[in-house]
Regions:
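Solvent-exposed loop and edge beta-strand segments that line ligand/cofactor-binding
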Residues: 109
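Structural detector for internal amphipathic alpha-helices that build alpha-solenoid repeat scaffolds
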Residues: 1, 8-23, 28-34, 41-53, ...
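Amphipathic alpha-helical surface "interface" segments used
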Residues: 100-105, 126, 376-378
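HEAT/HEAT-like alpha-solenoid repeats
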Residues: 64, 95-103, 209, 337, ...
Length: 430
């Protein structure tokens, strides 16, 4: 072949050998190694990675070492990795294992993380009985990328015993390793076939994995806490909701926000647990809790919101008023009207929004009828408070009432009527 035509022709032939995988060409290709032509060398190395056997391991190992175990023009390192995988597939397990071990040691010394990862992947596949041991060894490494690669590879063979050993390892690990493991456990739990295994996992008969994860919430390192919280959210065991809600009672704003985000994402009923912690939380925790009740539209917990309106700080009161519209229902109409008619100026708008929300499921005509009756009870001095509510109904009868208020009203009443007309969504008010 070395005498067959031009260099281009030779390269084309070598590429064809690689594509068709002509195993008999291995010895001829080995003779062609060491070409000063980088492109020719690249083709030969690639071809050997496709057609070679254990007989070519030492040759490609030397080429990879010369390349510094990194990507370069000849592709020697990639070719060597591919050949080791091929040798493993051919059933020469011991040879592949030996080569992978050697590559792992030398690439580690060279600081080539990607090559280390590739070697580890082969090693895990070559020796399944030692896979857990090799995984735990990798988790002791100082390179985060390498640790995470090991965990990702482990996803392919992880079972109950692997999860137990990894979580046991986590108990004694440094914070950065704990974070990697916790994130991995969370990802694993999202796999339908693995979810129940992880949810019901026990490290021993008196130590469920759930408790191990909950204990990480007490870790001094915030990132460990964060990773544990999200693992718990992904696992979705509803029994941990009260513990997550307790994060709202923290004095650390960062932890409060973590708890809020976790509860917001949790697929389950968080309302009662959140309502329970609000009274004893700091102002930041109270506000986070009120926002959660609003997001979850927790109308069964209206009283919790009302309590904060009565006794909270100015910031908490503002959050409670803002939440009000999302936690009310039709039955709260009379209560809200009473609050509106006695409210301070700053509370008028959120109370109006709450009334609009409370009656929003009624037919528009019924809304107008109910509001008109309440306006009569409120008296002339308070009628204007309901113009915004009437405007939200979109009913012509309501429009007439607002226009009348604009024409006959003075001061605040006239301003309220004008604002209501400006907020009208139809063209009738134009």
């Amino acid at each position: 072949m070395r005498r067959s035509g031009t260099p281009k022709t030779q390269k084309d032939i070598i590429r064809a050998i690689a594509d068709v995988q002509i195993a008999d060409a291995e010895n001829v290709l080995k003779v062609m190694l060491g070409s000063s032509d980088e492109n020719m060398q690249k083709e030969v190395l690639y071809a050997l990675s496709r057609v070679g056997s254990k007989a070519s391991l030492s040759d490609l190992a030397a080429a990879a070492e010369k390349a510094g175990y990194k990507m370069e023009k000849t592709g020697a390192n990639e070719a060597y990795i591919a050949l080791i995988k091929r040798v493993l597939e051919q059933g020469d397990t011991k040879d592949a294992e030996k080569a992978a071990n050697d590559l792992l040691k030398k690439s580690t010394k060279a600081g080539m993380t990607q090559t280390r990862e590739a070697a580890l992947q082969i090693l895990l596949a070559a020796k399944p009985e030692a896979a857990t041991k090799n995984l735990l060894s990798a988790l002791k490494d100082t390179d985060k990328g390498y640790r995470n690669a090991a965990l990702n590879f482990a996803s392919g063979f992880a079972d109950q015993n692997v999860y137990i050993e990894v979580m046991k390892h986590m108990l004694k690990a440094k914070p950065e390793v704990k974070v990697d493991i916790l994130n991995w456990i969370g990802r694993e739990s999202k796999c339908p076939s693995k979810h129940d295994v992880i949810k019901n996992l026990e490290l021993r008969f008196d130590l469920p994995a759930r408790q191990v994860l909950l204990d990480q919430l007490k870790d001094k390192d915030f990132y460990v806490q964060q990773a544990a919280v999200w693992a718990l959210v992904k696992i979705g065991d509803k029994s941990v909701i009260p513990v997550l809600a307790d994060l709202l009672k923290s004095n650390d704003k960062q932890v409060i926000l973590l708890g809020q985000d976790a509860l917001m994402a949790f697929n389950g009923d968080i309302d009662q647990a959140v309502a329970k912690v609000i009274p004893s939380a700091s102002d930041a925790g109270k506000i986070a809790g009120l926002e959660l009740l609003a997001i979850r539209m927790a109308d069964a917990n209206l009283n919790t919101v009302l309590d904060q309106i009565k006794s909270g700080s100015s910031e908490v009161k503002k959050a409670a008023y803002t939440a009000l519209k999302d936690v009310v229902s039709e039955k709260d109409f009379t209560l809200l009207c009473g609050m509106l008619e006695t409210a301070e100026a700053s509370a008028v708008a959120p109370l109006q929004d709450a009334i609009i929300a409370a009656i929003s499921k009624q037919p528009a005509a019924t809304q107008v009828s109910n509001v008109n009756r309440r306006m009569i009870q409120a008296g002339d001095s308070k009628r204007y408070l309901y113009y915004k509510v009437l405007s939200a109904t979109g009913e012509k009868e309501a429009l007439a009432t607002i226009v009348e208020g604009l024409n006959k009203g003075n001061g605040a009443a006239k301003d309220a009527a004008l604002d209501a007309l400006l907020a009208w969504k139809g063209i009738e008010a134009a």
